[in-house]
Regions:
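Glycine-rich phosphate- or other oxyanion-binding loops that anchor nucleotides, phosphorylated ligands
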Residues: 25-154
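A short, Lys/Arg-enriched amphipathic alpha-helix followed by its capping loop at the start of a domain
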Residues: 14-20, 36-40
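Short N-terminal binding/cap micro-motifs at the start of the first secondary-structure element
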Residues: 11-15, 53
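Extreme N-terminal starter segment of soluble prokaryotic enzymes
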Residues: 1-3, 42
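Short, hydrophobic beta-strand segments that form beta-sheet elements in well-ordered domains
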Residues: 4-5, 148
Length: 154
């Protein structure tokens, strides 16, 4: 089963509305929307803004629903000039943009004791790219694969 997380209602509402056989389950202060999307079992949930909310929600998806893959969807900023509104970015790796221990010899974004970057599941990333390319949406928008950054600074 696949879990799909969005921080805000606007990021998950159309997915929830598209679920076939939708049921809602309340757990831990979250409303999980379970159903089928393109004949695949999914659980869609609004996590709330921030890394902690996303982590808590992801843990509940794993423990309560047995998801084996999690997709985070939503609105984001970009540092590159080659992306437009509604373009897709699929991560190849991720890092924190709001964590700085460089004074202690760590790389920017690196949490002590952890790798400086988190490597994405290449198989899942490739599936997302394949699915995107099969949608009419892909004719008007592009998809790129690369480094993404996460943080709680706005």
């Amino acid at each position: 089963m696949t879990g799909i997380i969005g921080a805000m209602e606007a990021e998950v509402q159309s997915l929830c509305d598209s679920l076939e056989g939708r049921t809602q389950i309340e757990e831990g202060g979250y409303v999980f929307n379970k159903g089928k999307l393109f004949n695949k079992d999914v659980v869609v949930v609004k996590s709330g803004i921030g890394k902690v909310n996303s982590a808590l929600c992801t843990q509940l998806l794993i423990l309560k629903f047995g998801v084996n893959q999690v997709i985070n969807t939503g609105i984001a900023g970009a540092t590159g000039g080659n992306l437009g509104i509604f373009d897709f970015v699929v991560s190849s790796k991720a890092l924190y943009h709001d964590f700085d221990t460089t004074a202690f010899g760590y790389k920017p974004g690196q949490v002590p004791g952890m790798d400086p970057e988190f490597i994405a599941d290449e198989k899942l990333s490739d599936l997302v790219i394949k699915a995107f390319s099969q949608m009419d949406f892909s004719k008007e928008h592009k998809i790129v694969k690369g480094l993404v950054a996460s943080g709680d600074q706005f």
